[in-house]
């Protein structure tokens, strides 16, 4: 399907229940509706984010008792992934509090984390903070 602004607007303006129905129909076409995927969320870098996203407990507006940590090591992430796998998870989602992920040694380390978890026959997804893209 080729995505156009018109097609996106058409979907966006549909009633919520119609969207839910269509999404469930497509989901059932490809997945057993009686099964769920178990995932584990791992905060690979906590605290220190300068953003103020209202939904995020790490946002500057919230004063929580979260102990911040710098970027986890690849081995720490692998340990979390193994624990998750042992408990039945098939996916690890890595989250990091960042303003903008740069193409630097931290990003290279995240790529290594992804590769390492994939080598354990697990799926990986990442939420790496707000990224600013300049075109």
Locate the predicted segments by residue.
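Flexible, acidic/Gly-rich N-terminal and inter-domain linker regions that tether
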Residues: 1-55
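Conserved alpha-helical substructure of the radical SAM core
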Residues: 60-96, 112
């Amino acid at each position: 399907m080729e995505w156009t602004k018109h097609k996106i607007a058409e979907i966006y303006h549909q009633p919520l229940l119609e969207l839910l129905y269509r999404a469930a129909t497509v989901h059932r076409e490809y997945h057993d509706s009686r099964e769920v995927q178990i995932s584990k969320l791992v905060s690979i870098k906590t605290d220190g984010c300068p953003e103020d996203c209202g939904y995020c407990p790490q946002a500057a507006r919230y004063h929580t008792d979260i102990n911040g940590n710098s970027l986890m090591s690849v081995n720490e992430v692998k340990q979390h992934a193994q624990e998750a796998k042992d408990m039945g998870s098939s996916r690890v989602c890595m989250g990091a509090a960042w303003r903008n992920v740069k193409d630097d040694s931290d990003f290279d380390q995240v790529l290594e984390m992804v590769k390492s978890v994939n080598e354990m026959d697990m799926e990986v997804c990442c939420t790496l903070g707000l990224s600013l893209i300049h075109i």
